[in-house]
Amino acid sequence: MNAATALARPGLEPLVTGISDIVSRRLGPRRTAYTVADLLRDRLPGLDILTPQEREGSPDGYVSRPLYAHEDFSIVSVVWRPGQETVIHDHVAWCTFGIISGIEHETLYRDMGDHLLEIGRADNRPGEVSGFAPPGDIHMVRNTSGEIGVSIHVYGADVSRLGSSVRRVYDLPVR
């Protein structure tokens, strides 16, 4: 994809326009993440942003699908079947996410060098939005609900070009 690629999604334009305006202000990663989170809270799309088939997810693991990509940010849907989870990881850039359905249970960690220290947990429910920026963004996410979970993630990078929002996967003991 080139500098800006809109993947036709009815209803996405108000979110794209708002994020473009915020990103153009060059507020810094953490402030950008929090400002985009405020916008996403007001403009979080509904389930109809995905087709019924896309909302089914996959039995093989959660599915990330780019909805919009630009050199400065990407909008990605993530679909999780019950019990599906990520590995422990951090990100290449700031991130904001909003929950459309399901419950995303997030466990937060701090890298202590030879191990990870669990520093928090949160259950993110439909309508809830959060944002963060590296460093300090190490987490694992799991759909703990009995239904398919759908969330919208906004990353401060072109993940269609990078292939992923993940910077590093952590395989350290947790204490």
What would you call each of these model-derived segments?
Residues 154, 161-175:
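Domain-scale activation on soluble regions of proteins
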Residues 52-82, 129:
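A short glycine-rich, His/Asp/Glu-containing loop-to-beta-strand
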Residues 76-90, 134-136:
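Conserved short histidine dyad/triad with adjacent acidic residue
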Residues 1-46:
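N-terminal leader/capping segments at the start of a protein or of a new domain
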Residues 111-139:
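Short acidic-glycine-tyrosine-enriched beta hairpin
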Residues 96-98, 146-162:
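A short hydrophobic beta-strand segment most commonly corresponding to one strand
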Residues 141-145:
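Asparagine-centered strand-capping/turn motif at beta-strand->loop junctions
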Residues 93-110:
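Glycine- and acidic-residue-biased ligand/ion/polar-headgroup-sensing regions
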